[in-house]
Amino acid sequence: RIRVGNILTDSTNFTFVYIEESQNEAIVSIPVQLVGKATDEPRPVNIKVVGGSAKEGDDFVLPANPVLPAGASSFNYEITLKRSTALQEEAKTIEIAIEENEYFRPIITHEITDIQSGTDVSTMRHKIEFSELFTEAPAAWYTYIYPFTPQRFFLTCRVMDIPRSDFNDASKISSFRFQYLMSEMVKYVAEQLLLENPDPEIFDENGTPIF
């Protein structure tokens, strides 16, 4: 079971867009919570892939022999996601489920998240969706100052030598710094246009400068 704020959720969305290009893998950590008493013995947990479009081994790797440690009431189930060019076109999914074994028997399979509507989530299954796509502009890309496009984002990170993850953290890039970055990018593109062989990444698919 995972909580986002105070809300229980049975799904995780992950994108590689904020991960540097040199990094080919990322780990998604799924908390597994015990309902019951902890014991002084480690206990294996039976977690299996039950669906999804991603292929085990090619797109992701599961932990070998997950175990709830002795004395613990929870542990993190860490799935290694593999980066591929296909993720730039569409998302892939993994669906996992906790299954009964000699140590654990499911008692609570769903929990209600909204009493009025009766909306509930599964406590035994979890879906991971991952891609290298943007679902929205980064937190520190101030669209009222300069409209966002993925191409502008990637070019800015490269030219200004800024980690991609910084753009998803408003404490690292203020609106004032963002204004400076945009002015520098406009200047960079203008300088490139004067060259015989300008940086090809300054043009969109129609050949128009992106800044």
Predicted regions and their residues:
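Short glycine/proline/serine/threonine-rich loop/turn segments at secondary-structure transition edges
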Residues: 85-93
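Exposed aromatic-hydrophobic patches
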Residues: 74-82
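Short proline/glycine- and polar residue-rich coil/turn motifs
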Residues: 66-75
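Beta-strand-rich extracellular modules
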Residues: 82, 97-101
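Extended, structured, electrostatic nucleic-acid-contact surfaces
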Residues: 54-66
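A generic structural motif
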Residues: 36, 83-85
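Intrinsically disordered, low-complexity regulatory regions in eukaryotic proteins
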Residues: 1-43, 51-57, 76, 92, ...
